[in-house]
Every structure is written in C-alpha cells, then in structure tokens.
Amino acid sequence: MKLLAIDGNSILNRAYYGIRLLTNKNGVYTNAVLGFMNIYFKNFEEVKPDRVAVAFDLKAPTFRHKAVDTYKANRKGMPEELAQQLPIVKELLTYMGIRIVECEGYEADDILGTLSKVCSDSGGECCILTGDRDSLQLVNDRVTVRLATTKETIVYTPERFIEEYGFEPIYLIDLKSLMGDSSDNIPGVAGVGQKTAGALIKRWKTIESLYENIDGAELSKGVYNKLINGREDAIRSKWLATICLDVPVDYDIENYKISERNDEKLSDLLTELEMAKLMQKLGIEPSEKRASEKTVRAVDVKTQLKDIDEEILGGFLKMNSICYLFDGKAFKSAQRLDDENFITVSYTHLRAHETRRHL
C-alpha cells in the first residue's frame, strides 16, 4: 500500500510562480492549472501509488490562528489570477477520481500529517508531495517527503534529512522553535539564528532538554540571556510549528484509492482550458470532436419539433446557449430531414464550460 499525499495549496502556488501567466481564448488563467498537473503526473509516475489524496486549506481560521492572532498575519492574500484557478484544479482532480481532503480549523499540513500517520500505522508507505519544508518533520522509515523546488524535486528520507541537518527529522520542530519562521510569522527566540539553533538542537535535541540543562550547558553569556528571555516565545513557537496528527478526516486508507475517471467531463473542461497535451496524456479526445462524431439522440421524423423542444431543450432555449448538431455541423435550429428516418439533436450549455448531451 502506497499513498501519495499532496499539499494542494503549496503545489498550486509553486506551479503558479513557476510558469508565466497563461490564459485560454476566453481570458481564463491556466498557468497554475497546467503546472499543477505537470507536477502531479511527474510525481505520480515516479512514486506509482495505489492511493492518492490532495489536501487543501480552507479560508476559515485554524486553531493556530484562533490561539495566536499574529500567526501568518504577515501573509499576503492569494493573487486573483491564482485564486481563479483553485476551483478549476479541484474540479479536474474530482473528474480524475482523486480524493480531495479539507477540514475546517486545520491546515493542509495537518491533514498530510494525519494521513501519513494513519497510512504508516497501517503498515503502508506514504509519500508527501509539497513545496513546504514544514512537512520534513514527518519523515520517518515509512514516510518520505518529496520537496518540489524550482529546479528539482528533492526526496527526503531519514538518511537524507540527517545528512543535511545533522539531527533526526522530528527535531525540526525544535529548530524552528529557536530560530523561528518568518514566512509563518513564528517568532522563535529573538537573536538566535539558524546556525546557533542548529548547534543547540544537535546537542540537546529538544528545547525541553535544552532548558532543563541550560544552567550547566556552558553557553556564551549572550546566547544564555537570549534563551532565558525568549523561553516563552520558544515554547509558543514549538506549539505553532508542530503538525497535528489527529485531524478528524476519513481514516480508512482504502477510501483514497483512485476512483473511476469521468472522461466526458474531463474532455469538456480540458477542451475549454485548451490543454490538448494534457488530454493526449490522459488518452481522451476534445469534446468538439466527440460531439460531432457521436449521435446523441435519434428521433423519429414523425415526432413534432415542439415536443423535442419541451423534452430536451427546456429553459436552455431562453439562454441562447443551444445549438443543434447534424453530421458534424451546427445549426441555430433543428433541421427536418425528409429524406432520412431520423434527425440528430444535441445542445451546448456554454455557461457551465461543458458540452452536455441528453441521451
């Protein structure tokens, strides 16, 4: 059993800034969608998971925001060009049969941590895909983190982490407790940087052990005073930096198997987004081609046109979003074919970004 757990917001954000702004002919931004899907497929092909979950943040404040009002208070809002692409990515994932996981009051990191624990406790292997180093604290013998960077994806195993940091992954929390994290507005201990914090954690592992032994720790006077004065900040910072492992989400890993793909909806949406290469990768045809090649409904020529309107067209006729297709050609109204036994009727609902068929 292998679960690929993806930090949706982090990967989408990285995809957005990694590709220049792109739009389709209708002005819909698509660069983040394209980048996200490229990153997804690359990692899916390398990991070869049999289960996939994509975690997203919600707009509602988390338990951290409620407890510490300065937490992430320095973050700017999501650019509108990116915000427009978030629901599109979620729609694509849904049509691809991939499980989306969200939980009010918690961050995507917490969901990833919880799923990785559930998976590893069940004897499975979890690969976390993210652009955020916070998740490195989750690395263990059954959990690896694939850190997406601008140039490459770095795979963190316990050995790789120790080689880089000099201590075990779980103590990354304590490192951040001392040095802080400006991106999340976690203060840490004022005046203690990464080098000093790293040396302290290599020796003492946890801030609890450090403070228990601080009087005999043979620290310089400056570092000693900073630690004493910043003790409360260190404790609060550790709490903020610790990923929650018991988020109330679906704990049944079987439910994260990829479900049946909806090729019709995928084709319609990807045609709208003008992503031909992605359609080719998925092995599906553009919706226009399918619409022109497929007889949607055969109606006996004796059937009155008004009956077809009432049954098939309904209120869509008033929205001016109807066209009839016959032999691959579109008409403003249905064509009566006296020399044939049937007519073919189809319609397009443009506002919903999809070609609909009434069978």
Question: What do the PLM-derived regions correspond to, one by one?
Answer:
Residues 1-129, 133-155, 159, 233-236, ...:
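Noncatalytic, basic helical substrate-engagement surface that gates or grips nucleic-acid strands
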Residues 7, 54, 112, 132, ...:
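A residue-level signal for conserved active-site and pocket-lining positions in enzyme catalytic cores
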Residues 48-53, 98, 121, 141-144, ...:
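Non-catalytic nucleic-acid-binding/docking modules located in mid-to-C-terminal regions
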Residues 101-111, 288-314:
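Charged, flexible boundary elements
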Residues 314-334:
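Gly/Thr-rich phosphate-binding beta-strand-loop-beta motif of the actin/hexokinase/Hsp70
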Residues 330-331, 337-346:
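Short, intrinsically disordered, charge-balanced linker/junction segments flanking boundaries
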Residues 348-355:
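Conserved small/polar residues in nucleotide/adenosyl-binding loops
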